[in-house]
Amino acid sequence: MNSNWTDTVKTMTGFRLTTLLAVSASALTLAACGSAEVASPGEGDFGGGGGGGTPPPTTPPPGTPAADCPTGFANVGLVAGGTLRACQLPQQINGALTVPLRAGTVYAISGRTSVGTDQGVDPAAPIAGSTQGILTIEAGVRIFASGGSDYLLVNRGSQLFAEGTAANPIVFTSRQNVDGATTESSQGQWGGIVLAGRAPQANCQLTAPVTCTGTVEGTAAFYGGNSQTDNSGRLRYVQIKFSGFEISTGNELQGLTMAGVGSGTTVDHIQVHNSSDDGIEIFGGNVNLRHIVINGADDDGLDTDTGWRGGAQFGIVTQRPAGSTSRSAGFEFSSAPTSVPLASRYVSQPKMANWTLVGRNSTTDAHTVAHFDSGTDATIINSVFTAASTSLAGCMAINDADTGTSGVTFNSVFMSCTLPYRPSNAVLSAAAFTAGTNNTANGVSTLTAPAAGTSLSNQLLTFINGANENAVTPVAAATTYAFFQNTTYIGAVQNAADTWWQGWTCGLTAGATC
C-alpha cells in the first residue's frame, strides 16, 4: 500500500481496512449446479454455452480444446485462439471442490469467488448457518480472471490447497495473458487472491485482541480472532500474475492478501508478478513465508500492517523503474492503528531473513528501498538492500518516533544506495542501523543478474550475491526465530549454483516468459 510519506501516522478510520468493495448482490445470487453444496457461476463470460459436463473420455491432441468441462464447472467457451476450453469455478464453493489438471483445459473465476462463508472468530463455535469450503487445485492448473472485480476469497474457517511443483507450478493470471496479449509492463488485469483467517490482528483498541474482527481491504470479508495457529491451507509453487486493482483511493486488491492468517498455513515458493498495487500485503496474523519472489509491483513489494507477527525467509523483490505509484518500497512495514497509544498498541513484529531488495532504477522519485513506520517492531537479518537510482531518497527510512521507540533491529544487513538513509529521518534510521552487528551502510554492490536471456528488461534483476555480499558474516537465523533456517550467507541467493528461484517462476530465466 502506498503510505503518505509525509505523514507519520495513520488514523483508525484511515488505515485502509474499512473501505469495502461493493460487490453486487447479483454476483452472489447463484443458481444451483449439481448439488446444494456447489452453486453455478452462471452463463458463459466468453460466449460459450452450457453448464458442466463430465470429463472427456480421451485426452485431446496438443492444441485441441477439451470437449467439455468437469462436473461442477461451467463451460464458458474457448480462449487462447480456440485452443483451450474455459471452465468456470462456482462463485460460491461450499464443501470440497477439486480443480483437476486436464489437457486442453484452463479454468476461470468471475466476480468474487468465495470459498466457504465467514465462520466467525471461534473455530469451536462457527457462526450459525455458515459453511466451510475446501478448494484443492492440482499441480499445473492455470486459472484466469478477466477484470478487476474478479478475485478469489478464502473465508475464515475455509481452506485453499494450491500445491504445485517446481516443474508444474499453479498459475493464477489474466484473460489477456491466456490470450497472449500481455507485455512486460502489463498489470492490474484482475483482482488477486485473498486469504482471511482467525489469527490476532490490531484492528481494535486492545493490547491483545481476542475477538477482534476487521474487514479485508478491497473486499467485504471479515478476518481476525485469537487462533495464532489457524490454518487457511497450503500454497506451494504458485505464480500470481498481472493482478491488483484499485477500488478507490487507498483501497486496493493486491496480488496476494493475507489477513489474520495463522501459522498453521503454509506459504512457500510464491511469485507475484506485475501487481498494480502491492505484491503481497499481510494484515495481522502469524503466518510464515518462505521462498518468495515479487517482481514488477507498482507499489510496495511486501507490505505489512495491523499486527503481523510472523516471519519470512528467502525473498527476492525487484521493483519496476516507474509507475503510477512513484513512492513505493521493497518493504513497507506499519503498525496501524496509531490512534492507540504505543504502549497499548498491538504492534507488528515482522521478522525477515535472507531477503534481497532491488529498488527502482528510476531517474525521479525512486524513494526508499525499505520503509518502517507507526511503531513497527521489525527484525531484519542477513539481508541486502540496493538500488542504482540517483533519485533514491535513501536505502532505508525509520519514519517516526514511535518506530524509533519500538526499535527496528538490523543484523548482518548490507546496503548499497546513493544514500543509506532518507535525510528527513536519518538520525533515527542511523541509530537503529548502527546499533546492530555486521551491518554495512555504504557498501558497493557486487550483485549480478541471471544468465542472459531473461524476458524482463524493465527492471534490474541483480539479485545474485557477489564477493562483497558474501563477505558479510551472517547471524544465526534460527536463534532469532525458530521458523528460520541457518545459512552461511546473507541475501536471498548465495551464488549461481543457488537455484531455489528457478524452474517455477516466470521472467527470470531464459525461456520462462510471463
List PLM regions with ranges.
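Bacterial Sec-dependent N-terminal signal peptides
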Residues: 2-8, 23-78
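Sec-dependent N-terminal signal peptides
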Residues: 15-25
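Extracellular beta-rich repeat passengers
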Residues: 42-48, 60-132, 146-157, 164, ...
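Catalytic metal-binding/acid-base residues of hydrolase active sites
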Residues: 142
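Glycine-rich loop(s) and the adjacent beta-strand/alpha-helix scaffold that form part
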Residues: 168-169
